Amino acid sequence: MKTSMFLTLTGLVLLFVVCYASESEEKEFPKELPSSIFAADSDFKVEERGCLGDKCDYNNGCCSGYVCSRTWKWCVLAGPWRR
């Protein structure tokens, strides 16, 4: 029983290693990984993100889509729950 479990586990590990090696040859995984991380990072940048939480007053407005909070005096998202 122990021998068959050991052989099964060894076979699965060997299958995993062979599959991983064939995929890494096709994709050149170590070379493409850093470039794919930095490419995905640039997709998440939003232009108006810096406006949220900025200090404001009624003379100095916020970006479009944001309003100045009366209590906290910073830019917050405009919505139907805001007065």
Curated annotation (Swiss-Prot):
Belongs to the neurotoxin 10 (Hwtx-1) family. 51 (Hntx-8) subfamily. Hntx-8 sub-subfamily. Disulfide bonds join C51-C63, C56-C68, C62-C75. Residues 1-21 form the signal peptide. The keyword Signal applies. Expressed by the venom gland. One of its GO terms (molecular function) is toxin activity. PROSITE patterns: HWTX_1. InterPro entries: Huwentoxin-1, Huwentoxin_CS1. The presence of a 'disulfide through disulfide knot' structurally defines this protein as a knottin. GO terms for cellular component: extracellular region. Agglutinates erythrocytes. This is U5-theraphotoxin-Hs1a 5. Keywords: Cleavage on pair of basic residues, Disulfide bond, Knottin, Lectin, Secreted, Signal, Toxin. The keyword Disulfide bond applies. It is found in: Secreted. Residues 22-49 form a propeptide.
